[in-house]
Swiss-Prot record:
Signal peptide: none annotated. Disulfide bonds join C27-C33. It comes from the Eukaryota. One of its GO terms (biological process) is defense response. It comes from Pelophylax ridibundus. This is Brevinin-2Rh.
């Protein structure tokens, strides 16, 4: 249903945000930003 779709969208968005945060953190730690 719609709720399942929204939950999946939230999961996907959360994963994307986490990945970009991890990328930023790792590039700052390695000094390659």
């Amino acid at each position: 249903g719609i709720m399942d779709t929204l939950k999946n969208l939230a999961k996907t968005a959360g994963k994307g945000a986490l990945q970009s945060l991890l990328k930023m953190a790792s590039c700052k730690l390695s000094g390659q930003c």
